[in-house]
Amino acid sequence: MEGIIIKGIGGFYYIKTDEGIIECKARGKFRYNSLKPMVGDRVTIKVENGKGVIEDIHERSSELIRPTVANVTQAFVVFAIKNPDINLDLLNRFLTLCEYNDIHAVVCLNKEDLCTEEEKENLKELINDIGYEVLFINAKEGKGFDALKERLEHNITVLCGPSGAGKSTLLNSFIDREHMETGSVSEKIGRGKHTTRHSELIDVDNGYLVDTPGFTTLDVTFIDRDSLKYCFPEFNDYNNLCKFNGCNHYKEPKCAVKEAVEEGKINKLRYDFYIKTLEEIINRRGN
């Protein structure tokens, strides 16, 4: 029987299967192989005498450390439009981490009622131009909620963003609605509102939402200097057009990315952020 781990605590794992939620323990072999089951893992289980055992952990597409979740495919990057104003460097850090982890990012701009249509259009154009979808929401009033739910289908989605952006309001809105719709499931696994630090998955519209915010650590200096450029999707059309193979678009001559910046084809603020991050990596790691 196959399923997905939606919660793990105290050595017990709760697996959602076609036959319902089954409480399981892991085989001892995983400890010997230094492989620990994670929330989000797709697993094969066996039920013996009414007790479930995890027999196999399927290959993971991704692993996040904070929160500890496997196979995340999508991130809602939540920022307030105002109060506080958008910090573009911070937004770029979140987007860089999403790209590094091969997670599809959707930028969700909260408190949309605090800005004009012109301001919204400018922000949308700016973010669309670097390759990301933008959704305008009002977490307190539930505006934009349906558009978010549409994007949850067939994904494991994590919310991320700075403090005060509205992540908790948005998350609790999802949790409250799912409590009303799936009360029996909630009772089965003992879900409460942030009563534990252990992550779990909320089943929403044929997808899952991680109940704890993602990317609580925003350090990007662990990224290899030669890999950073691949975290900027707007560079993709130019990475192979530079004179030198392996060009990092830094101090190398005849660089197609730098030419695209000069021609206005790549946003200069994004390129400046890339250079700042690259220099952080070089200075931190001395390479």
Swiss-Prot record:
Subcellular location per UniProt equals: Cytoplasm
Q: Where does GTP bind?
A: 110-113, 161-169
What's the cofactor? Answer: Zn(2+)
> A Gene Ontology MF term for this entry?
rRNA binding
**First-listed, main subcellular location of the protein, grouped into a coarse class:** cytoplasm
Keywords, A to Z?
Cytoplasm, GTP-binding, Hydrolase, Metal-binding, Nucleotide-binding, Ribosome biogenesis, RNA-binding, rRNA-binding, Zinc
Q: What superkingdom does the record give?
A: Bacteria
Where does the CP-type G domain start and stop, copy by copy? Answer: 61-218
At the top of the EC hierarchy, this enzyme's class is hydrolase
Provide the GO biological process annotations: ribosomal small subunit biogenesis
Q: Which PROSITE patterns match?
A: ENGC_GTPASE, G_CP
Q: Name one Pfam family in it.
A: RsgA_GTPase
The UniProt record lists the EC number as 3.6.1.-
Q: Where does Zn(2+) bind?
A: 242, 247, 249, 255
How many cofactor units bind, and how?
Binds 1 zinc ion per subunit.
Q: Which GO terms describe its cellular component?
A: cytoplasm
Listed under subunit, the entry gives: Monomer. Associates with 30S ribosomal subunit, binds 16S rRNA.
- Described purpose of this protein according to its UniProt entry: One of several proteins that assist in the late maturation steps of the functional core of the 30S ribosomal subunit. Helps release RbfA from mature subunits. May play a role in the assembly of ribosomal proteins into the subunit. Circularly permuted GTPase that catalyzes slow GTP hydrolysis, GTPase activity is stimulated by the 30S ribosomal subunit.
Q: Which PANTHER family match?
A: SMALL RIBOSOMAL SUBUNIT BIOGENESIS GTPASE RSGA (PTHR32120), SMALL RIBOSOMAL SUBUNIT BIOGENESIS GTPASE RSGA 1, MITOCHONDRIAL-RELATED (PTHR32120:SF11)
Q: Which family does it belong to?
A: Belongs to the TRAFAC class YlqF/YawG GTPase family. RsgA subfamily.
Q: What is this protein called?
A: Small ribosomal subunit biogenesis GTPase RsgA
